[in-house]
Amino acid sequence: MRYDDITEAIGNTPLVRIDPAVHGLRTIDLYAKLEMLNPFGSVKDRAAWNMLRPDLAGAVERDAQVVELSSGNTAKALAVLAGLHGLRFRSVTNRMRVPELRELLLLLGAEIEELPGRSECLDPTDTDDPLTQFHRALTEDGAHHLHTDQYFNPRNTEAHTTGTGPEIVKDLGGRAPDWFVACVGTAGSSTGVARVLREHDPGVGVLGLVAAKSDFIPGIRTLDEVAEVGLFDPETYDVIEAVTADEAIDGMVELNRRCGLLAGPTSGAAYRGAVSHLRPLDEERARRASGEPAERATAVFIACDRVESYLGYVRRRRPELLGRAPHRNALATVTEAELAAVRDAGVAEARRWIEEERPLVVDLRGSHAYAALHIEGAINIVDELFEQQVHGGLPFGRDRPVLLVCPVGEKSARFAALLTRMGHTNVRSLAGGVVAWRDAGAPLVRE
């Protein structure tokens, strides 16, 4: 197939049936929409081009810089598209958590600006959040930049109402699937596809998948974060369920090894979430058939992007998959029972403890967030580096008082549970994190 421009290769991705011998569903045909085969490697290629294209001529004329609040696939696609048209691109984020994507953005000539922030995406109601302030500044003055605004731009959703959704219907012979499954990041793809499918059949079931609380799966928000996304509408989904990072990796490995799909952990989360949700429905359908062949139903999930960019993510969480010894003292092994037993300290209690016993206060946030505001006397060890230290054993004396601090108290509680299991006798987590400390009017200092 011949193209005159690489952007012509965006879209029209294959819809591939997953072998039932792999997923085990007896009455439901499960299909993967291979968005990973877009030319820049992900489902975000569609939205990036649809958001950029209408304003491209004006941006070129005034030599504007393309700017997006993204640390992942949207930034990657926009960096390529901007470069194609002689424009500069700047990625603004609170934290680059996938080093391979950071390096690729730099290779593509992108400028990366990291700001302190409490979430992977901005909260327009939080006027103190630097990402929110930056977003507002971009919105108010567009003379020298083109802000594609993926979290609020309706063209994000439109890319899927005009492309992805109709392609699924066409490839299924003109009918919508019985179920559609998508991970929720900006909510653009899930909203756009669901809208089209329900126009064909209002009875289509839509499953939205989010990351489990305090977990990190690239490209997926937690339930708390997703409410901050302007395109997110809970009415789009019949049900929203959580997927863990371990489940995402397990699903990814199954797609890689059993299905020949070199998809990443986001795709693994969509696959594993789809199978888990559909299994009881499949069993009920088989039971009702009473031994007769059941009428086939269909389900589609989005295979978002490729695996190659996430080998570091796998190495940190499941090193045994890459031929390395499993990490001792891994954060992912903390149980709910251990978490429930953690000694939390509210703001008032923590202030008294600091005054009376002078515990070591360890701030687990990124360096930019720490520099912006932190508890006086706290040291900064970014959570990923802290976990690497813990892999080798207790980083402090067993009896030394330690107060762990993170944005909202979730990650610090998991670390406190892990250190307690390892034998530390006096570690606590700041309940509610820095946000609770700030909201209580407790003092914070700047670097």
Predicted features, each with a name:
Residues 1-352, 360, 366-392, 403, ...:
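PLP-dependent amino-acid enzyme catalytic core
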Residues 395:
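Short, polar/acidic, helix-capping and beta-turn segments at strand->helix junctions
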Residues 400, 407-408:
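Mid-chain, well-packed structural core segment of small domains
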Residues 414:
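Active-site-adjacent pocket-lining segments in enzyme domains
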Residues 432-436:
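Histidine-bearing beta->alpha loop at or near hydrolase active sites
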Residues 442-445:
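Short, Lys/Arg-rich amphipathic alpha-helical interaction segments
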